[in-house]
Amino acid sequence: MDIKEVWKRITSHAGELFYTKKGVPYTYHISGQRIVLENTNRNIPYRDIERALSLPDLSVTKLNQLNVQGPSYLYGIITDRRIIG
């Protein structure tokens, strides 16, 4: 999926409830080119989303290996049907 479309969907669903793969609920807001997680002090930069979308088969483990910020949270966002369509 195109990063611009994914980012547009991510921004439009800011403030809504999302879940990590293990079911931990969280919300986020957008600040510039970052996802700011509201239940932790983590920020996920736009470039980490780009890197995650480049993976042929997405998993939390693979996101961890990419050394992205908040891999469990990022996974929860970019695999959610509101974001991927």
Whereabouts are the PLM-identified features?
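Intrinsically disordered, charged low-complexity linkers and terminal tails
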Residues: 1-85
